[in-house]
From Swiss-Prot:
This is Cytosolic sulfotransferase 9. Its main location: cytoplasm. Expressed in roots and leaves. Its EC number is 2.8.2.-. Residues 1-24 are annotated as: Disordered. Belongs to the sulfotransferase 1 family. The lineage of its organism: Eukaryota, Viridiplantae, Streptophyta, Embryophyta, Tracheophyta. GO terms for cellular component: cytoplasm. It is found in: Cytoplasm. The keyword Cytoplasm applies. Sulfotransferase that utilizes 3'-phospho-5'-adenylyl sulfate (PAPS) as sulfonate donor. No activity with brassinosteroids.
Amino acid sequence: MDEKDILRNLREEEEEEEENQSEETKILISSLPWEIDYLGNKLFKYQGYWYYEDVLQSIPNIHSSFQPQETDIVVASFYKSGTTWLKALTFALVQRSKHSLEDHHHPLLSHNPHEIVPYLELDLYLNSSKPDLTKFLSSSSSSSSPRLFSTHMSLDALKLPLKKSPCKVVYVCRNVKDVLVSLWCFLNANKGVEWGDFSQNEKIIRAENYSFKAIFESFCNGVTLHGPFWDHAQSYWRGSLEDPKHFLFMRYEELKAEPRTQVKRLAEFLDCPFTKEEEDSGTVDKILELCSLSNLSSLEINKTGSLGGVDYKTYFRKGQVGDWKSYMTSEMVNKIDMIVEEKLKGSGLKF
């Protein structure tokens, strides 16, 4: 048997394995409880969290094939919590010896952070159990270390691969009220995008404008993609308390209030602390400027580029803390505050 035949047989075996795994997952999904979300898509509840069917199918792929290296870094978040910013900061930090912050060809000047740091469940393992990890900029070279990945999944969903081989995980948490407002604005800025389960032929609901009230009620009920929000946040909060060497819990509000302190904290956690020479030469401030909302949003790639039908410019809005005050009624505020207080009781986590 020549080399071509061996490779062909290996591919056929892999395809058969993926088909069998996909069928097993479909059988599992058919037995799960489900609800209709504010986008008109089915959400399935699996091990306490809500997923679209196609995202749910990526979980077995991640569990069976994702093998973290000790030097890997996973940027984790609930969506609309500062993910884009944290991806940019993390890449700039760990790659600063390779990519000078003053280089006019720095990758962040020509690539959106979501291109550079791929999602495990969306970009890599959504349709494959053995994705090509080398096609992404942050892991394109065999000598590229650390590799950078991201996820919106809870820590509970990632425990299996991380147990086999722990790596560094950075989680950014944001006040749920600002998450709600940011999500609503983001969805309405991308009205032409078919959100949700792309394997679903028809949405049950179609709307020109996404209802803020509907999104609010879904969050309050905990029925939202990767939700409930409070369980998601608590999974990483517990991880940071139990294993601070591998899990860092960051708050968006603290990043905004004291960016220099928080970026230095992030660098320490990622084992790439700033030297005295770097601090004296303003390296911290250069990273903050490179990754700032004003700088990233002004770049041509982020003004005109897109990925998956989503315009990059819609990832950059106000980035303000407390913007929810312009959108939420006092009744809404009281309701969600009471729910969050109750759900977080005894955890030590507060907003």
